[in-house]
């Protein structure tokens, strides 16, 4: 786990969960690049910067199906899986762990999705096209 704030880790999984707390930006990217995937379980995300950062690190994502924004990103980019309950979550994690080549390919696809859609020049062009400048 990465991020600020307190988290209560159940005793039965404490040995398997590492709470790194708040990290500086490079350590965050290094942790992301070395991970199996990034999990963004929120049901109430808008645009998720951390998902884009994960894809730039060539890692796939795992998001909650009830979050329209992040599950749409996962579907549109073909760079993530989504879950609705614990059993689907577990299945998705196992899929990534047992299929590292597919996970790596999904991460690369995610990186290209970010570069194709959210690089500064792409965003500026969208604004200019919108305003017909």
Regions found by a protein language model. Give the residues of each.
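Short hydrophobic beta-strand element within catalytic cores of glycosyltransferases
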Residues: 60-64
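Nucleotide-activated donor-binding/catalytic signature segment of Leloir-type glycosyltransferases, i.e.
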Residues: 8-29
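Short alpha-helical segment that forms part of, or immediately flanks, the ligand-binding pocket
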Residues: 29, 47, 52-56, 70-72
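C-terminal alpha-helical cap of glycosyltransferases
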Residues: 7, 120-133
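Conserved acidic donor-binding segment of nucleotide-sugar-dependent glycosyltransferases
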Residues: 76-87, 95-100
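A short, well-ordered alpha-helix in the C-terminal region of glycosyltransferases
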Residues: 95, 102-116, 126
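Aromatic "clamp/platform" in nucleotide-sugar-dependent glycosyltransferases that forms part
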Residues: 43
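Short acidic/histidine- and often glycine-rich active-site loop of Leloir-type glycosyltransferases
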Residues: 10-11, 52, 66-77, 81-82
């Amino acid at each position: 786990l990465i991020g600020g704030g307190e988290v209560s880790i159940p005793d039965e999984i404490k040995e398997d969960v590492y709470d790194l707390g708040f990290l500086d930006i490079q350590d965050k990217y290094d942790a992301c690049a070395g991970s199996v995937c990034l999990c963004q379980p929120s049901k109430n995300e808008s645009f998720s910067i951390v998902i884009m950062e994960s894809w730039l690190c060539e890692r796939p994502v795992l998001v909650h199906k009830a979050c329209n924004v992040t599950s749409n990103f996962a579907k549109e980019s073909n760079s993530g899986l989504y879950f609705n309950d614990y059993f689907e979550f577990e299945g998705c994690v196992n899929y990534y762990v047992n299929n590292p080549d597919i996970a790596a390919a999904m991460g690369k696809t995610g990186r290209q999705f970010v570069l194709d859609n959210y690089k500064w020049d792409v965003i500026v062009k969208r604004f200019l096209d919108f305003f017909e400048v």
